Amino acid sequence: MTIQEFRDYMASGKPVVGGGEVHMMFHQLSQEALRITAEINGKYHTPEELHTLLEQLWGREVPKTVGMFPPFHTDCGKNTIVGERVFINTGCKFQDQGGITIDEGALIGHNVVLATINHDLDPARRQSMSYAPIHIGKNVWIGANATVLAGVTIGDGAVVAGAVVTKDVEPNTIVGGVPAKVIRKIDV
């Protein structure tokens, strides 16, 4: 299975069967992500060196204007798309099997978790996993320690303030709390 076939399968919404081809690809990609993130997190890198490592990790071209302060963690890496002028602060964790898209100008604060995987609520089926993409719009600011769950879209210009985001966020809106609730609209 190629990386593109993996991405296409994950976008299809079909289940991942334990021991199947996609599940085995998970393991392969996880091992590669562990190796690359250990390199990213293990020592200082110039911005140019870090950029090269991010392209290896994400398996695609990364805009030169993307910035990151390590450490950074991911358990897949190959299903993240990042736009121009995105900044990812220290301590972030991306669980990107379901797909993460971060549009241009977005700011991702310290210790943010983006989780595209869910487990079944029924204890008898809890080992099963479902996947849904996360989409972060243009010029979004996700503040420190926020968590964004599978299937969420955060609209352009929104601000997420220390929240657990379980539902879509409208553009130009500030949300906060657990679970995230609208605080106010942003006048633009």
Where are these regions (language model features)?
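Active-site-proximal glycine-rich helix-loop-beta segment
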Residues: 144, 161-164
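Flexible, glycine/small-residue-enriched loop-and-beta-strand segment within the central core
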Residues: 72-153, 178-188
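Extracellular disulfide-bonded cysteine-rich modules/repeats
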Residues: 172-173
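Terminal amphipathic alpha-helical/low-complexity segments used for targeting or macromolecular assembly
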Residues: 1-65, 180-184
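Conserved G/P- and acidic residue-centered "switch" motifs that form tight phosphate/ATP-binding loops
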Residues: 160, 177
